[in-house]
Amino acid sequence: MSPQPPSPTSAPAGSLTHLAVAGYRSLQQLTLPLGVSPLGGQPHGGLTLVCGANGCGKSNLYRSLGLVAAAARGDLVAALAAEGGLPAVFWAGPERTTREMHRGEQPVQGSSGRREAARLRLGIAGETLSYAIELGYQSDDHTSAFVLDPEIKREWIWAGGPFHPRSLLVQRTGAVVERCGDGGRAVPIALEVSPHESLFTAASDPLEAPEVFQLRRTILSWRFYDSFRTDRQSPARSGRIATRTPSLAADGGDLAAAVQTILEIGDAEAFQAAIADAFPGCHLTVDTSAPLFQLQLHQPGLLRPLEVTELSDGTLRYLLVAAALFSPRLPPLLVLNEPENSLHPDLLAPLARLIAAVAERTQVWVVAHAETLITALEDGSDCRLLRLERELGATVLPGQTVLERAAWRWPA
């Protein structure tokens, strides 16, 4: 029996339509269309599948979306510092390339000086609200030891997808955040904002700036799952004191509580069907007799269930992905980075069916490397496939038309 999409809670409306990145690692200038949630009534399903050879920039896309979430949380500078700071994350290639460079007739080389200041730009376009941020080096105080810290130069929030000055709702320039009122009149709503603080934390009052509050709340509800640890000391095997858990933690440490929550208030029947689809004849229970819940996998032919400490890495990782996807509280965006890691090839078809089922209810972004999973998702679901390549060190989407690239416009 193939898994059915979880049913208790629908995802919020307002799906992403585009992700735009400029100046970040291999993403010199890239705009990607995203599969839109079927709740929005769009032609594409809710699944975006990003694939490509090693080194093509898949992980950079995953990280760039995570940086947008970090801006909403208020820890963007810390997130960039964890990646090595601006010197490590800026596009390392030339500011401009020539036709001769692309044809191999001229070596790739930079000019004697930059025409424009180095900038890192991130942007998301949504059905209802869109956002962009621009960061760069500090422009003054060169005596400080923190001169290489990222500085937020500008931010914008506007209505709808494609940017137009008349659709601008909130903008931040330097230390001032303004709300754009009727007739283009700008009203300051935050002054003396730190160059390291996003408008999401500086001006998120629901009455004074409802757009900021609404978009921040949406972004904070995104969920990212990247390479669950399954070693003997991993949080997923160690567990933690159980409380009701409508969303699995990013480290999987609350797996038993998350499964018990699914069994109590989620779609328990579909969840067990998904487990049986991957492991025929098996089902899950949770021992709730102690504050530290114990997950148990029942297998045909065994006289007792297996506890999480006894499971193989691949089995545990599949259970973690299943628990994340069957959350009773679906997010507006669910991002999975190479969920097929450490899984036996026989589990990839059930995994594809599980992902496709959840994409019927909310927007799902999958970064995948295994061709078996990619083919299964292509064949079994309505997905938008983005197969990336590298050209002169830059990540590109082959075949993208001028009109498709023009669907995103950076605010000025």
Regions found by a protein language model. Give the residues of each.
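Catalytic acidic motif of RecA-like/P-loop NTPases
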Residues: 25, 66, 312, 340-341, ...
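C-terminal lobe/lid and adjacent interdomain/linker elements of RecA-like ASCE P-loop ATPase modules
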Residues: 2-15, 349-412
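Short, hydrophobic/aromatic-rich segments at coil-to-beta transitions
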Residues: 13-19, 113-122
